[in-house]
Amino acid sequence: MANHFRTDRVGMEIKREVNEILQKKVRDPRVQGVTIIDVQMLGDLSVAKVYYTILSNLASDNQKAQIGLEKATGTIKRELGRNLKLYKIPDLTFVKDESIEYGNKIDEMLRNLDKN
């Protein structure tokens, strides 16, 4: 039980720090407008799956954001190492969060049902 609590707590700290690093330290224009939604940690804290969303719906912007995040991974890990007191900084995997678009699609379908 305590291990699950620790993974959640470390995930919340990484989420907060990565958002701040993206705003203040990463100068890549491809990651402008990227917001970290959630971080899921592996049980041994070796890997962090970072879920993000972007303001644009264009596929090209999504692809550019993914590439920009992958290029900035070294900078992000270095800053995490400076700011967090962890034995080992986890490997970061960035995944686009599709839940918002999925929710919008369902909402639109429900509105179309009301019209018919």
Curated annotation (Swiss-Prot):
Subcellular location: Cytoplasm
PROSITE patterns according to UniProt: RBFA
Keywords: Cytoplasm, Ribosome biogenesis
A GO CC annotation given for this chain: cytosol
UniProt KW Cytoplasm keyword: yes
GO molecular function, one term: ribosomal small subunit binding
Pfam families, sorted: RBFA
Residues of the signal peptide: none
Biological process annotations from GO: maturation of SSU-rRNA
Cross-referenced InterPro entries: KH_dom-like_a/b, RbfA, RbfA_dom_sf, Ribosome-bd_factorA_CS
Homology family: Belongs to the RbfA family.
Known function: One of several proteins that assist in the late maturation steps of the functional core of the 30S ribosomal subunit. Associates with free 30S ribosomal subunits (but not with 30S subunits that are part of 70S ribosomes or polysomes). Required for efficient processing of 16S rRNA. May interact with the 5'-terminal helix region of 16S rRNA.
NCBIfam families: rbfA
Subunit structure: Monomer. Binds 30S ribosomal subunits, but not 50S ribosomal subunits or 70S ribosomes.
Descriptive protein name: Ribosome-binding factor A
Organismal lineage: Bacteria, Bacillati, Bacillota, Bacilli, Lactobacillales
